Amino acid sequence: MDSKEGVVHSVCTSAASVADKHMLPDLLHGEERKVWGDGGYQGQTEAIQEVAPQAQDMTSRRTKFKNYIDEEAKRKNTTKSKVRAKVEHVFRILKRVFGFDKVRYRGIAKNHHRLCANFALINLYLHRKRLAVLGA
C-alpha cells in the first residue's frame, strides 16, 4: 500500500501454508522508500534491498533476548505498529463493505482475480470524494 496516496499497488495470493516472507519480493515494486512489516518479515533486509535498493527496512525487531527486555526496541516496535495499523483499514473495507469475510476455495488463480478486482474497487471507494470533485 502506498503511504502517500493510500492506494493498494500490489496484490499477491498464495496457499495458506506459504509464509508471508516468501511473498515479499512480489509485493514490492522497487520504488519504495520505507518497507513496514510485522515480525513475520523480520530478517528480510536482503530481500528488500534486492528489489528496492533505496528502501529502509522498518520491520519489527525482537525485543526479548534471553532474560533481557530491550525497552527502546519495544518502544520503536510500538511506533511501527501504529504506522502499520493504517493498512488494516483496507482489509476492513474488503471484509465489511465488499463482503469478503469467507473465502471459498475456487483455485488460487480465481481467488487472485477476485481479490484484484476487489482491491481495485477499494481504491476507488477510498478516493470517491476526490474523484467526485474531479468529475464535477
Q: Model-predicted segments: where are they?
A:
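Polybasic low-complexity intrinsically disordered regions
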Residues: M1-V51, C116-I122, A136
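Helix-centered, glycine/charged polyanion-binding patches within enzymatic domains
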Residues: H29, R33-K34, G39-H113
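Short glycine/proline-enriched turn or capping motifs at secondary-structure junctions
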Residues: H113-N118, L131
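A short, flexible helix-boundary coil/loop motif
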Residues: R130-A136
